[in-house]
């Protein structure tokens, strides 16, 4: 059965989901909702449908898989991952998954708040000042492992790739994105299914954010 992923026509919160669908070879189709032109960016392409899909909490992204209808990006990731035993196996692995999942969301939201803020240029120096420390924490958490939980991929690696790739785009010369974090990014991009997806016309690297953001709000 083909699942349907619904989201705006941007990278955003759907990026890790798309990567996981591709990696697991899950048959899927996308409903990419488009905003109207500036300055209003009319969202009616989505709002006209949102109450008609049978979602408990109508929002984007959503995933429809037969009778299963989910919103919340991490709930969607976990649903896909459970089908493929990618949520950690031991209790310690599951703990690492849970901690990193929530920590990465904190990092993602802090970056989004910066990029959507009208004071972007004023706030950017403080963000850049604290970023190296955050990346060093992730580097220590990864350690010498191949993946963030151990030797086997879990869904948090897809989240981590997305978050780290955004920072790499934002600060290309960041020293803290070298070493094991750089190796992690390269290792992830070298995965056969991921590499093929990134070379395909389906892949969307940008825009990361909605059109009102002050950074990375346009297609490349």
Curated annotation (Swiss-Prot):
InterPro entries: Glutathione-S-Trfase_C-like, Glutathione-S-Trfase_C_sf, Glutathione_S-Trfase, Glutathione_S-Trfase_N, GST_C, GST_mu, GST_superfamily, Thioredoxin-like_sf. Changing residue 210 to H/I/P: Reduced catalytic activity. Keywords: Cytoplasm, Lipid metabolism, Transferase. This is Glutathione S-transferase 2. Conjugation of reduced glutathione to a wide number of exogenous and endogenous hydrophobic electrophiles. Participates in the formation of novel hepoxilin regioisomers. GO terms for molecular function: glutathione transferase activity; identical protein binding. Belongs to the GST superfamily. Mu family. Glutathione binds at residues 7-8, 43-46, 50, 59-60, 72-73. Homodimer. Its EC number is 2.5.1.18. The keyword Cell membrane does not apply. GO terms for biological process: glutathione metabolic process; lipid metabolic process. The gene is GSTM2. Substrate binds at residue 116. Residues 2-88 form the GST N-terminal domain. Residues 90-208 form the GST C-terminal domain.
């Amino acid at each position: 059965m083909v699942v349907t992923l619904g989201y705006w026509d941007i990278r955003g919160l759907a990026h890790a989901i798309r990567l996981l669908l591709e990696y697991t070879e899950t048959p899927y189709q996308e409903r990419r909702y488009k905003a109207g032109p500036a300055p209003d960016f009319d969202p009616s392409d989505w709002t006209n449908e949102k109450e008609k899909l049978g979602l408990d909490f109508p929002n984007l992204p959503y995933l429809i898989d037969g009778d299963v209808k989910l919103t919340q990006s991490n709930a969607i990731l976990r649903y896909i991952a459970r089908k493929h035993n990618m949520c950690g196996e031991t209790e310690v692995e599951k703990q690492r998954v849970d901690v990193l999942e929530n920590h990465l969301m904190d990092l993602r939201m802090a970056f989004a708040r910066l990029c959507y803020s009208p004071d972007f240029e004023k706030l950017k120096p403080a963000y850049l000042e604290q970023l190296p420390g955050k990346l060093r924490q992730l580097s220590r958490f990864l350690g010498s492992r191949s993946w963030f939980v151990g030797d086997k991929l879990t869904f948090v690696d897809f989240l981590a790739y997305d978050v780290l790739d955004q920072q790499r785009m934002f600060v290309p010369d960041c020293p803290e994105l070298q070493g094991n974090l750089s190796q992690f990014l390269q290792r992830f991009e070298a995965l056969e299914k991921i590499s093929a997806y990134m070379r395909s016309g389906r892949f969307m690297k940008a825009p990361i954010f909605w059109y009102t953001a002050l950074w990375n709000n346009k297609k490349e």
